[in-house]
Amino acid sequence: MASPTLLRTFGSTLAALLLLTTCARAVPSIRYSWDACDPVVLDHEFVGPGHYVQTLSVTGLVLPFTSFEAHIAIGPGLFSAWAFYNGACQGAGRMTVSTAAGGCQTIPGLLVTANVVPGLTDPTAHLYVTASVPAGFTPDPTARYTLLRIDFDHTATTTGSLDPPGHCGSGDLPYCFGIESMAINAHSLPGRDFDVENGVLTWNLASTPGQCPFRVAVRPSTWGRLKSIYR
Protein backbone atom coordinates (compact mmCIF):
# COMPACT_ATOMS: atom_id res chain seq x y z
CA MET A 1 0.00 0.00 0.00
CA ALA A 2 1.37 3.38 -0.96
CA SER A 3 2.27 5.69 1.89
CA PRO A 4 0.32 8.96 2.43
CA THR A 5 3.50 10.91 1.64
CA LEU A 6 3.92 9.10 -1.68
CA LEU A 7 0.25 9.69 -2.56
CA ARG A 8 0.57 13.38 -1.73
CA THR A 9 3.70 13.62 -3.87
CA PHE A 10 2.00 11.84 -6.77
CA GLY A 11 -1.05 14.08 -6.41
CA SER A 12 1.08 17.22 -6.44
CA THR A 13 3.01 16.01 -9.49
CA LEU A 14 -0.21 15.14 -11.35
CA ALA A 15 -1.70 18.54 -10.57
CA ALA A 16 1.44 20.25 -11.84
CA LEU A 17 1.36 18.21 -15.05
CA LEU A 18 -2.30 19.04 -15.60
CA LEU A 19 -1.54 22.72 -15.08
CA LEU A 20 1.31 22.58 -17.55
CA THR A 21 -0.90 20.78 -20.07
CA THR A 22 -3.62 23.40 -19.67
CA CYS A 23 -1.10 26.20 -20.12
CA ALA A 24 0.40 24.48 -23.14
CA ARG A 25 -3.02 24.25 -24.76
CA ALA A 26 -3.88 27.89 -24.10
CA VAL A 27 -3.58 29.89 -27.30
CA PRO A 28 -4.31 33.52 -28.15
CA SER A 29 -7.98 34.22 -28.82
CA ILE A 30 -8.93 36.62 -31.64
CA ARG A 31 -12.09 38.75 -31.52
CA TYR A 32 -13.61 40.50 -34.55
CA SER A 33 -16.16 43.21 -33.82
CA TRP A 34 -17.82 46.38 -35.00
CA ASP A 35 -17.05 49.51 -32.96
CA ALA A 36 -14.93 48.92 -29.85
CA CYS A 37 -13.27 45.72 -28.65
CA ASP A 38 -15.88 45.15 -25.98
CA PRO A 39 -18.76 44.39 -26.03
CA VAL A 40 -18.83 42.34 -29.22
CA VAL A 41 -21.04 43.83 -31.95
CA LEU A 42 -21.68 41.37 -34.79
CA ASP A 43 -23.92 43.46 -37.06
CA HIS A 44 -24.06 47.12 -38.01
CA GLU A 45 -26.79 48.88 -39.92
CA PHE A 46 -26.23 51.72 -42.35
CA VAL A 47 -27.85 54.66 -40.58
CA GLY A 48 -26.56 57.36 -42.88
CA PRO A 49 -23.28 58.96 -43.92
CA GLY A 50 -20.54 58.75 -41.30
CA HIS A 51 -17.62 56.69 -40.07
CA TYR A 52 -18.04 52.98 -39.32
CA VAL A 53 -15.37 51.08 -37.39
CA GLN A 54 -14.25 47.47 -37.06
CA THR A 55 -11.71 46.09 -34.61
CA LEU A 56 -9.55 43.00 -34.28
CA SER A 57 -8.34 42.29 -30.76
CA VAL A 58 -6.57 39.49 -28.93
CA THR A 59 -6.26 38.08 -25.44
CA GLY A 60 -4.02 35.31 -24.17
CA LEU A 61 -0.85 36.66 -25.79
CA VAL A 62 2.45 35.22 -24.61
CA LEU A 63 6.04 35.73 -25.67
CA PRO A 64 7.22 35.81 -28.32
CA PHE A 65 4.80 38.02 -30.24
CA THR A 66 6.42 39.53 -33.31
CA SER A 67 3.87 39.69 -36.13
CA PHE A 68 0.25 39.35 -37.13
CA GLU A 69 -1.54 38.87 -40.45
CA ALA A 70 -5.20 38.62 -41.42
CA HIS A 71 -7.13 38.23 -44.66
CA ILE A 72 -10.81 39.16 -44.62
CA ALA A 73 -13.31 38.57 -47.44
CA ILE A 74 -15.89 41.31 -48.11
CA GLY A 75 -18.96 40.46 -50.17
CA PRO A 76 -20.93 39.38 -51.99
CA GLY A 77 -20.33 41.61 -54.95
CA LEU A 78 -18.10 44.62 -55.50
CA PHE A 79 -20.60 47.37 -54.77
CA SER A 80 -19.58 51.02 -54.58
CA ALA A 81 -20.24 51.48 -50.86
CA TRP A 82 -17.46 49.04 -49.93
CA ALA A 83 -15.08 49.74 -52.82
CA PHE A 84 -12.23 51.05 -50.65
CA TYR A 85 -9.46 50.47 -53.17
CA ASN A 86 -7.63 52.47 -55.81
CA GLY A 87 -9.67 53.36 -58.86
CA ALA A 88 -12.98 52.52 -57.17
CA CYS A 89 -15.77 54.76 -55.91
CA GLN A 90 -14.59 55.15 -52.31
CA GLY A 91 -10.90 54.90 -53.09
CA ALA A 92 -8.16 53.70 -50.77
CA GLY A 93 -7.89 57.02 -48.94
CA ARG A 94 -11.25 56.71 -47.19
CA MET A 95 -10.09 53.68 -45.22
CA THR A 96 -7.65 54.30 -42.37
CA VAL A 97 -6.16 52.08 -39.69
CA SER A 98 -4.88 52.65 -36.17
CA THR A 99 -3.76 50.58 -33.19
CA ALA A 100 -5.96 51.92 -30.38
CA ALA A 101 -9.60 51.02 -29.73
CA GLY A 102 -12.04 51.31 -26.86
CA GLY A 103 -12.08 48.42 -24.42
CA CYS A 104 -8.52 47.32 -25.25
CA GLN A 105 -4.98 48.01 -24.22
CA THR A 106 -2.53 49.13 -26.88
CA ILE A 107 0.65 47.37 -27.97
CA PRO A 108 3.51 49.89 -27.83
CA GLY A 109 5.10 50.48 -31.22
CA LEU A 110 2.69 48.22 -33.13
CA LEU A 111 2.87 48.98 -36.86
CA VAL A 112 -0.18 48.05 -38.94
CA THR A 113 -0.95 48.34 -42.64
CA ALA A 114 -4.15 47.36 -44.44
CA ASN A 115 -5.43 47.50 -47.99
CA VAL A 116 -8.42 46.25 -49.94
CA VAL A 117 -7.98 44.38 -53.23
CA PRO A 118 -10.80 43.28 -55.56
CA GLY A 119 -10.96 39.56 -56.25
CA LEU A 120 -9.31 38.28 -59.41
CA THR A 121 -11.84 35.57 -60.23
CA ASP A 122 -14.65 36.09 -57.72
CA PRO A 123 -16.98 39.05 -57.01
CA THR A 124 -15.46 39.58 -53.57
CA ALA A 125 -13.09 42.17 -52.14
CA HIS A 126 -10.27 41.11 -49.84
CA LEU A 127 -8.90 43.09 -46.91
CA TYR A 128 -5.24 42.33 -46.18
CA VAL A 129 -3.74 43.26 -42.82
CA THR A 130 -0.11 42.98 -41.73
CA ALA A 131 1.36 44.06 -38.42
CA SER A 132 4.76 43.96 -36.78
CA VAL A 133 5.65 44.24 -33.11
CA PRO A 134 8.96 45.74 -31.97
CA ALA A 135 11.22 43.87 -29.59
CA GLY A 136 10.75 44.51 -25.90
CA PHE A 137 6.98 44.12 -25.66
CA THR A 138 5.96 41.78 -22.83
CA PRO A 139 2.24 40.96 -23.09
CA ASP A 140 -0.06 40.30 -20.17
CA PRO A 141 -1.89 37.03 -21.04
CA THR A 142 -4.99 38.23 -19.16
CA ALA A 143 -5.25 41.55 -21.02
CA ARG A 144 -7.06 42.28 -24.27
CA TYR A 145 -4.98 44.15 -26.86
CA THR A 146 -5.94 45.98 -30.03
CA LEU A 147 -4.49 44.40 -33.16
CA LEU A 148 -6.31 46.68 -35.57
CA ARG A 149 -8.87 49.47 -35.59
CA ILE A 150 -10.09 50.15 -39.11
CA ASP A 151 -12.16 53.23 -39.95
CA PHE A 152 -14.35 53.11 -43.04
CA ASP A 153 -15.26 56.65 -44.08
CA HIS A 154 -18.82 56.41 -45.38
CA THR A 155 -19.49 60.15 -45.44
CA ALA A 156 -20.02 59.90 -49.22
CA THR A 157 -22.11 56.73 -49.04
CA THR A 158 -25.77 56.74 -49.96
CA THR A 159 -28.57 54.25 -50.55
CA GLY A 160 -29.79 52.86 -53.85
CA SER A 161 -27.90 51.18 -56.67
CA LEU A 162 -26.84 54.37 -58.46
CA ASP A 163 -23.78 56.50 -57.67
CA PRO A 164 -24.82 60.18 -57.65
CA PRO A 165 -21.98 62.60 -58.45
CA GLY A 166 -19.49 62.52 -55.58
CA HIS A 167 -21.30 59.69 -53.80
CA CYS A 168 -21.16 55.89 -53.59
CA GLY A 169 -24.40 53.93 -53.67
CA SER A 170 -25.57 50.59 -52.25
CA GLY A 171 -24.91 51.47 -48.62
CA ASP A 172 -28.22 49.85 -47.71
CA LEU A 173 -27.38 46.44 -49.19
CA PRO A 174 -26.57 43.50 -46.88
CA TYR A 175 -22.90 42.55 -46.74
CA CYS A 176 -20.63 40.10 -44.94
CA PHE A 177 -17.06 40.23 -43.66
CA GLY A 178 -15.43 36.84 -43.10
CA ILE A 179 -11.96 35.98 -41.85
CA GLU A 180 -10.31 33.94 -44.61
CA SER A 181 -7.05 33.30 -42.80
CA MET A 182 -4.89 34.57 -40.00
CA ALA A 183 -1.38 34.13 -38.65
CA ILE A 184 0.45 35.00 -35.44
CA ASN A 185 4.23 34.93 -35.70
CA ALA A 186 3.75 33.39 -39.18
CA HIS A 187 1.88 30.41 -37.67
CA SER A 188 -1.57 30.04 -39.19
CA LEU A 189 -3.26 26.89 -37.88
CA PRO A 190 -6.55 27.66 -36.05
CA GLY A 191 -6.93 25.76 -32.80
CA ARG A 192 -3.21 25.21 -32.42
CA ASP A 193 -1.67 28.65 -32.99
CA PHE A 194 -4.75 30.69 -32.05
CA ASP A 195 -8.52 30.53 -31.60
CA VAL A 196 -11.07 32.76 -33.34
CA GLU A 197 -13.90 33.87 -31.07
CA ASN A 198 -16.01 34.97 -34.02
CA GLY A 199 -15.00 35.04 -37.67
CA VAL A 200 -17.90 36.83 -39.39
CA LEU A 201 -19.44 40.30 -39.17
CA THR A 202 -22.55 41.43 -41.02
CA TRP A 203 -23.83 44.71 -42.43
CA ASN A 204 -27.55 45.47 -42.67
CA LEU A 205 -28.44 41.99 -41.36
CA ALA A 206 -29.82 42.78 -37.92
CA SER A 207 -32.04 39.68 -37.90
CA THR A 208 -29.04 37.35 -38.23
CA PRO A 209 -26.05 39.19 -36.71
CA GLY A 210 -22.74 37.52 -37.50
CA GLN A 211 -24.43 34.91 -39.68
CA CYS A 212 -23.84 35.39 -43.39
CA PRO A 213 -26.65 34.09 -45.64
CA PHE A 214 -24.52 34.52 -48.75
CA ARG A 215 -21.74 32.47 -50.24
CA VAL A 216 -18.65 34.54 -49.46
CA ALA A 217 -15.20 33.22 -50.27
CA VAL A 218 -13.96 32.43 -46.77
CA ARG A 219 -11.39 29.75 -47.52
CA PRO A 220 -8.59 29.23 -44.96
CA SER A 221 -7.01 26.68 -47.31
CA THR A 222 -6.16 29.47 -49.75
CA TRP A 223 -3.80 31.21 -47.29
CA GLY A 224 -0.60 30.26 -49.10
CA ARG A 225 -2.04 30.87 -52.56
CA LEU A 226 -3.35 34.32 -51.65
CA LYS A 227 -0.01 35.37 -50.18
CA SER A 228 1.76 34.27 -53.34
CA ILE A 229 -0.63 36.29 -55.52
CA TYR A 230 -0.72 39.55 -53.58
CA ARG A 231 2.86 39.74 -52.29
Which sequence ranges carry the predicted segments?
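A recurrent domain-boundary module in secreted/ectodomain proteins
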Residues: P190-V216
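Boundary/junction segments of secreted and surface-exposed precursor proteins
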Residues: T22-G48, T208-R231
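Bacterial N-terminal signal peptides that target proteins for export
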Residues: A2-T13
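Extracellular secreted precursors and ectodomains with disulfide-bonded cysteine-rich loops/domains
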Residues: D35, G87, G102, G166, ...
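Ser/Thr/Pro-rich, low-complexity mucin-like regions
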Residues: T138-N198
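Low-complexity, serine/threonine/proline/glycine-rich extracellular segments that form mucin-like
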Residues: V27-P108
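Bacterial N-terminal signal peptides
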Residues: G11-T21
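Structured beta-strand segments within beta-sheet-rich domains
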Residues: P49-S57, T99-G160
